[in-house]
A protein has these predicted regions:
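Secretory/extracellular carbohydrate-interaction modules
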Residues: 38, 69-147
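Low-complexity, Pro/Thr/Ser/Gly/Ala-rich linker/spacer regions in secreted
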Residues: 55-74, 230-235
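Flexible glycan-contacting loops in extracellular carbohydrate-active proteins
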Residues: 25-57, 195-229
Length: 235
């Protein structure tokens, strides 16, 4: 996996190779190149490369103005405090990253995600496609048909441990639009290294949608540097 990130006049390369046995090799480099458009390409030398087209994307930063959602004492009640709206056009992928804090009272007192039509809450054209919680539970709205059978997971099982692990967990949520479908993958990595992965998909059509986060006796600190909208290189 090679990432090329441009910041001002600089370009930063990070190359991560993961061997079949799990060994990871990471190489980094940066250089001043100015601000003109550049091209990148790969070359083989007594080697052979098979491209993973689905993993080849060009991304732009998502605008994050609200960097903290809720209050640090996790006292914000349900549906009172929200993140910014993040638009997701058809064919693109939104990535959101943040640090999760919880009251620990319930399995649901963590991050919550809503995908809705392209209007503000309470607007005349506002309707929800679905709301998804961190504890493998969700519900639908008027915009499309929700299907709980489409939820899957890895790493869940002990709810007492889950509640403890979600305090300070690093969370990455990816919303990928492919055709009429949207695919959600949420990965929470606890301080002790435990990983919880939650997946969901649903048919939502091809109109513009918005996503936003909600707290419920929880508190989220956005990682703005890792919030972005990605477009496929290979259409």
């Amino acid at each position: 996996d090679i990432t090329l990130e441009r910041k001002g006049d600089e370009i930063y390369m990070t190359a991560v190779a993961t061997a079949k046995n799990g060994t990871v090799y990471k190489e980094m480099y940066h250089q001043t190149i100015g601000q003109d458009v550049v091209r990148a390409f790969l070359i083989a030398d007594a080697s052979y490369l098979k491209m993973d087209a689905s993993g080849c994307t060009v991304s732009e930063p998502a605008k994050v103005e609200t960097t903290e959602i809720g209050t640090s004492d996790c006292s914000a009640a349900w549906w009172t405090t929200f993140s910014d709206y993040f638009q997701i056009p058809a064919g693109k992928t939104l990535n959101l990253a943040f640090e999760n804090h919880t009251s620990g009272a319930g399995n649901w007192n963590n991050w919550n995600l809503c995908v809705a039509t392209d209007d503000e809450r309470g607007g005349g054209n506002y309707a929800e496609h679905f709301v998804m919680r961190s504890d493998l539970f969700g519900w639908g709205g008027a915009a499309s048909v929700y299907n709980a059978a489409n939820i899957s997971n890895e790493g869940y099982g002990d709810w007492d441990q889950f509640r403890a692990d979600m305090e300070g967990a690093k969370v990455n949520i990816q919303l990928q639009r492919i055709g009429d479908e949207i695919y959600m993958t949420a990965v929470a990595t606890a301080k002790n290294g435990t990983v919880y992965k939650e997946m969901y998909h649903q048919t939502i059509g091809t109109d513009m949608v918005r996503a936003f986060l909600i707290v419920d006796s929880s508190y989220l600190k956005m990682d703005a540097n890792n919030c972005y909208l990605a477009s496929p290189v290979y259409e």
